[in-house]
Amino acid sequence: MATVYDVPADLLIKRVAERLKDMVAPPEWAKYVKTGVHKERSPEQDDWWYLRLASIFRRVYIDGPVGIERLRTFYGGRKRRGSKPPKFRKGSGAIVRNALHQLEQLGFVKKTREGRVVTPMGRSFLDKVATELKSELVSEIPALEKY
């Protein structure tokens, strides 16, 4: 059985986002916000919430136990400040927090004393998606079978 580590991250995130579209709805305010103070505009993709949700889910799987502040740092970026030199700024805490709440309501993530961790149900969900994705990739590229 393949795990999250065995498949490309971009393909896995897209596939998990498609699955999560049936399970959750983005908050009302999601269409009006930027993803952080370092951004000048809001996301152009209509389904950006599901992609961020899937990305956070994968991050918790890989890095867990992880907290909101560490995830904010991961999704941060360089803030342009005009003629002054750029500085790093963290990403939006509300987006990370609400995404984690949605994953907790689905039963995929739980809160512990050290931070958020993936539950066995969440690990099973991600591993099943990774296994399906890997079998499709092996049929396209037979050389991947040895991994």
Swiss-Prot record:
May be involved in maturation of the 30S ribosomal subunit. Belongs to the eukaryotic ribosomal protein eS19 family. InterPro entries: Ribosomal_eS19, Ribosomal_eS19_archaeal, Ribosomal_eS19_CS, WH-like_DNA-bd_sf, WH_DNA-bd_sf. The gene is rps19e. SMART domains: Ribosomal_S19e. GO terms for biological process: ribosomal small subunit assembly; translation. Keywords: Ribonucleoprotein, Ribosomal protein. The lineage of its organism: Archaea, Methanobacteriati, Methanobacteriota, Archaeoglobi, Archaeoglobales. SUPFAM superfamilies: Winged helix' DNA-binding domain (SSF46785). HAMAP family: Ribosomal_eS19. Part of the 30S ribosomal subunit. One of its GO terms (molecular function) is RNA binding. It comes from Archaeoglobus fulgidus (strain ATCC 49558 / DSM 4304 / JCM 9628 / NBRC 100126 / VC-16). This is Small ribosomal subunit protein eS19. One of its GO terms (cellular component) is cytosolic small ribosomal subunit. PROSITE patterns: RIBOSOMAL_S19E. The keyword Transferase does not apply.
